[in-house]
Amino acid sequence: MLASYASDPLKSRGRLYREIPTSYRNEFERDRDRIIHTNAFRRLQYKTQVFINHEGDHYRNRLTHSLEVSTVARSIANTLNLSSDLAETIALAHDLGHTPFGHAGERSLNECMKEHNGFSHNAQSLKILTLLEKRYAAYRGVNLTWEVLEGIVKHNGPISGEVNEYIEEYNSQNDLELNTYASAEAQIAALADDISYISHDLEDSIGAKIIDFNNLAELKYIDQHVFELKSKYKNISSSCLIYEVVRKLMHELITDLLWQTKTNINKEKITHIDEIRNLNYQIVDFTEKTNERIKEIKKFLHERVYKSNRITAISLKCTKIVQGLFKVYMEDVNLLPVNWKIQIDSNNPNSKARIIADYIAGMTDRFAIQEYNQLCSLNFNNI
């Protein structure tokens, strides 16, 4: 049974374009299915998490990461008597707007767009779901519920100050109440993302031999798990050891989040979802001690993994590809597919750059590499 402060699909604020409900799915389940059926969701399979797609078959990509985040979010929401369908749906959609080549690709595209209001993967997720996906005759986008769109846009908290151009444009026709917190389910999706990526980036980095168990000694909290497991299982393999370490880490993070969130709900005497939205802090959180540990792990990953020679070398190549593609398309829009080129508004000075950014952002890693080799390589065998 849902808590009184949960997002109830029967009380949804609805969709921008009104539709008749179905008898066999609630509104959030319907949204989940629509997201899974998008082209953007399928393309996540060939988009970078940490390692680009051809680095290996067993490393995580944006699709496997999104699926893992959704299972964590669903479990947490279930335990708290919140809408697991909403938490799962927001989690599945949270990375739809990512460029090829992960954060290196996003940084590069944002740099290309600096004179055209920049690029944000969060805003791009909204744009995909409300404009770029073209699956229905009656409207652009996939016409999701207000609660799902709110959760995607505000899952990291209220938006104040300078608002992204597309978010502001969409918000003018469907007010997402940008200055308030999102639902508890959206907050869960955001922290499920943290739990998943710090745990699994450690696992993949060990598997890729970017770091080893000696490096993990820098994280006393993690190193203690390694010591205990080695003591208990004398002949444990490295692959099994890191899996068990990650398993313990995820369990402890989830348990901590559940305890702190229940404490916050009881302290604030929460009885309605609007009380969650209007608080001056997010209701779903870790304890202070665990937040500090998470910061340590993120710092470790940043310094030991994301800034490693191997990842840096890959990132430089990815930057060259994204910037190279942007440059050639800006110089000659006839290189774009016709269905993209015709969208350019000659009366809007930012239109050409924005259409090109949308096109590049939708590329998979391998298509971006293929397109770069076709358009930017001096090897005439590629022509």
Swiss-Prot record:
Keywords: Hydrolase. Disulfide bonds: none annotated. It holds the Pfam family HD_assoc. InterPro entries: dGTPase, dGTPase-like, dNTPase_2, HD/PDEase_dom, HD_domain, PHydrolase_assoc_dom. SUPFAM superfamilies: HD-domain/PDEase-like. GO terms for biological process: dGTP catabolic process. The keyword Disulfide bond does not apply. GO terms for molecular function: dGTPase activity. Residues 62-198 form the HD domain. PANTHER family: DEOXYGUANOSINETRIPHOSPHATE TRIPHOSPHOHYDROLASE-LIKE PROTEIN, DEOXYNUCLEOSIDE TRIPHOSPHATE TRIPHOSPHOHYDROLASE. HAMAP family: dGTPase_type2 (MF_01212). Belongs to the dGTPase family. Type 2 subfamily. This is Deoxyguanosinetriphosphate triphosphohydrolase-like protein. It comes from Rickettsia bellii (strain RML369-C).
